[in-house]
Amino acid sequence: MRGVARNMARHQITANNIAISLTETPATQSWLADEQRMKATMSKYIVRRPGRPNDIANMALFLASNASEWISGQTYPVNGGFTLAL
Protein backbone atom coordinates (compact mmCIF):
# COMPACT_ATOMS: atom_id res chain seq x y z
CA MET A 1 0.00 0.00 0.00
CA ARG A 2 2.77 2.41 0.83
CA GLY A 3 4.38 1.85 -2.56
CA VAL A 4 1.11 2.59 -4.32
CA ALA A 5 0.69 5.72 -2.22
CA ARG A 6 4.20 6.91 -3.12
CA ASN A 7 3.61 6.34 -6.83
CA MET A 8 0.23 8.07 -6.85
CA ALA A 9 1.26 11.06 -4.74
CA ARG A 10 2.75 12.85 -7.75
CA HIS A 11 -0.77 12.83 -9.24
CA GLN A 12 -2.32 14.23 -6.04
CA ILE A 13 -4.00 10.87 -5.40
CA THR A 14 -4.03 9.25 -1.98
CA ALA A 15 -4.12 5.48 -1.54
CA ASN A 16 -5.23 3.58 1.54
CA ASN A 17 -6.81 0.22 2.23
CA ILE A 18 -9.24 -1.36 4.62
CA ALA A 19 -8.41 -4.68 6.29
CA ILE A 20 -11.71 -6.32 7.15
CA SER A 21 -12.57 -9.39 9.15
CA LEU A 22 -15.63 -11.62 9.45
CA THR A 23 -18.54 -9.66 7.97
CA GLU A 24 -22.24 -10.51 7.66
CA THR A 25 -22.93 -11.07 3.96
CA PRO A 26 -24.88 -13.63 1.94
CA ALA A 27 -21.57 -15.46 1.42
CA THR A 28 -21.01 -15.87 5.20
CA GLN A 29 -24.64 -16.54 6.18
CA SER A 30 -24.32 -20.32 6.59
CA TRP A 31 -21.02 -19.99 8.46
CA LEU A 32 -22.54 -17.45 10.84
CA ALA A 33 -25.57 -19.71 11.46
CA ASP A 34 -23.46 -22.22 13.43
CA GLU A 35 -23.98 -20.95 17.01
CA GLN A 36 -21.10 -22.88 18.56
CA ARG A 37 -18.63 -21.68 15.93
CA MET A 38 -19.94 -18.11 16.23
CA LYS A 39 -19.57 -18.11 20.02
CA ALA A 40 -15.98 -19.37 19.78
CA THR A 41 -15.11 -16.90 17.03
CA MET A 42 -16.75 -13.87 18.64
CA SER A 43 -14.85 -14.51 21.88
CA LYS A 44 -11.79 -13.29 19.93
CA TYR A 45 -13.41 -9.95 19.04
CA ILE A 46 -13.52 -6.99 21.43
CA VAL A 47 -16.88 -5.86 19.96
CA ARG A 48 -18.32 -9.42 20.17
CA ARG A 49 -20.20 -9.37 16.87
CA PRO A 50 -19.36 -9.90 13.23
CA GLY A 51 -18.93 -6.87 11.05
CA ARG A 52 -21.76 -5.43 9.04
CA PRO A 53 -21.42 -4.06 5.53
CA ASN A 54 -22.07 -0.55 6.88
CA ASP A 55 -19.06 -0.85 9.20
CA ILE A 56 -16.79 -1.19 6.19
CA ALA A 57 -18.77 1.29 4.08
CA ASN A 58 -18.40 3.99 6.73
CA MET A 59 -14.61 3.68 6.65
CA ALA A 60 -14.62 3.67 2.85
CA LEU A 61 -16.77 6.81 2.79
CA PHE A 62 -14.39 8.53 5.18
CA LEU A 63 -11.36 7.59 3.09
CA ALA A 64 -13.12 8.79 -0.06
CA SER A 65 -14.05 12.12 1.52
CA ASN A 66 -12.13 15.37 1.76
CA ALA A 67 -11.77 14.72 5.49
CA SER A 68 -9.02 12.20 4.67
CA GLU A 69 -7.15 14.23 2.06
CA TRP A 70 -3.94 14.23 4.11
CA ILE A 71 -3.98 10.48 4.79
CA SER A 72 -2.13 8.16 2.44
CA GLY A 73 -0.33 4.83 2.51
CA GLN A 74 -2.25 3.45 5.47
CA THR A 75 -4.08 0.24 6.23
CA TYR A 76 -7.12 0.57 8.46
CA PRO A 77 -8.27 -2.54 10.33
CA VAL A 78 -12.07 -2.51 10.52
CA ASN A 79 -12.44 -5.71 12.48
CA GLY A 80 -14.31 -5.22 15.74
CA GLY A 81 -11.07 -5.07 17.70
CA PHE A 82 -9.90 -8.51 16.56
CA THR A 83 -6.28 -7.34 16.25
CA LEU A 84 -6.40 -6.01 19.83
CA ALA A 85 -7.35 -9.45 21.10
CA LEU A 86 -4.39 -11.22 19.46
Predicted segments, located by residue:
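Short, small/polar-rich loop/turn modules that mediate ligand/substrate recognition or access, typified
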Residues: 9, 14, 71-73
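Short, cationic motifs built from Arg/Lys/His that form the positively charged side of catalytic pockets
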Residues: 2, 14-16, 48-49
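Alpha-helical segments that scaffold the active site and NAD(P)H-binding pocket
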Residues: 1-10, 20, 61-65
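Short C-terminal tail/terminal secondary-structure segment
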Residues: 61, 72-86
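A conserved structural motif in NAD(P)-dependent oxidoreductases
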Residues: 45-56, 67
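Glycine- and other small-residue-rich loops at beta-strand/loop junctions that grip anionic moieties
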Residues: 21, 48-49, 74
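Conserved SDR Rossmann-fold cofactor-binding beta-strand/turn motif
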Residues: 14-24, 64-67, 77-79
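A glycine/serine/threonine-rich, flexible loop-to-helix segment
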Residues: 10, 22-45, 86
